């Protein structure tokens, strides 16, 4: 269980000590599609980067169904530039630009945002109703998160404005410094690219480092996703991963809106009452 405290900032670099930053924004987009929420957030991020004087570049991966190859190709393209940071943002993530920019205030190698899973946490909704949470606030209590805290037992109290060490995080929102890939290059395998990339991230026969792959974790026999595999490889050589608990991210997905008319509560517009099939028709009596 995670208990968040709202307190003052800590661990933030002073302006004179901040290194020059140039960020490479990378988004895999299967089908070449992204959400409007992502687009709106990205435009605001661009304005925020310009206001801070942070140069940026962007690269997108279209129509690549294999997410491991998509991420590796984007990293391959990033390493050809002089950018200092790679920022993965998936095309179904909504974010606040100001909260994201706060990640740059901490000189950390790997930092990720924590976003909810694409499901409604009905247990949390029920609990919130019993606690008297107002109806207009219930949407803030519907999320399910996976937070992989490092070495904890029971309830942990952390500061909401301070990076939180985790053993793994999702690449749907992850900021990675260039030196991470440079160090991992010595320990991860390479493969020969045999896919035509219309976005120009990689050419045929390019040698691409496999930073992202699926793997089986020896200790638990779990199948690790590509982002957890990446985090494991980084931790194996002494690296650390941090989460940004101050970020409030949205994870856009599809949902079937359903219900039984006879069981729903009337809306403020006062829905008409529905009579059961065997009830007499008042108009005919």
Per-segment meaning from a language model:
Residues 5, 14, 18-20, 24, ...:
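C-terminal catalytic/acceptor-binding lobe
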Residues 55, 92, 109, 240, ...:
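Residue-level detector of anion-binding/catalytic polar loops
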Residues 67-71, 143, 227:
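Conserved donor sugar-nucleotide recognition element shared by glycan-biosynthetic enzymes
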Residues 72-85:
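Active-site nucleotide-sugar/metal-binding loop of Leloir-type enzymes
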Residues 83-94:
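Short beta-strand-to-loop acidic/aromatic patch adjacent to the donor-nucleotide binding site
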């Amino acid at each position: 269980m995670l208990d968040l405290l709202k307190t003052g900032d800590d661990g933030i670099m002073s302006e004179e000590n901040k290194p020059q930053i140039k960020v490479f924004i990378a988004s895999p987009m299967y089908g070449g599609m992204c959400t409007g929420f992502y687009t709106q957030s990205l435009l605001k991020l661009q304005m925020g980067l310009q206001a801070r004087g942070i140069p940026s570049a962007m690269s997108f991966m279209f129509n690549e169904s294999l997410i491991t190859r998509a991420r590796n190709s984007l990293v391959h393209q990033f390493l050809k530039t002089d950018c200092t940071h790679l920022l993965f943002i998936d095309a179904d993530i909504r974010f606040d630009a100001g909260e994201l920019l706060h990640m740059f205030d901490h000189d950390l190698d790997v930092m990720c945002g924590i976003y909810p899973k694409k499901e409604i946490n009905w247990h949390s909704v029920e609990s919130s109703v019993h606690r008297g949470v107002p109806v207009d606030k219930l949407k803030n209590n519907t999320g399910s998160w996976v937070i992989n805290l490092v070495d904890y037992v029971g309830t942990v109290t952390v500061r909401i404005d301070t990076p939180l060490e985790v053993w793994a995080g999702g690449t749907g929102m992850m900021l990675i410094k260039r030196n991470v890939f440079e160090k991992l290059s010595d320990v991860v395998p390479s493969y020969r690219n045999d896919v035509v990339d219309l976005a120009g991230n990689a050419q045929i026969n390019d040698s691409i480092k496999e930073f992202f792959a699926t793997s089986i974790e020896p200790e638990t026999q779990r199948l690790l996703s590509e982002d957890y595999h990446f985090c494991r490889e980084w931790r194996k050589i002494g690296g650390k991963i941090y989460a940004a608990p101050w970020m409030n991210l949205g994870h856009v997905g599809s949902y079937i809106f359903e219900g039984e008319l006879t069981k729903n509560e009337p809306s403020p517009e006062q829905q008409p009452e529905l009579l059961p099939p065997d009830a007499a028709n008042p108009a005919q009596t």
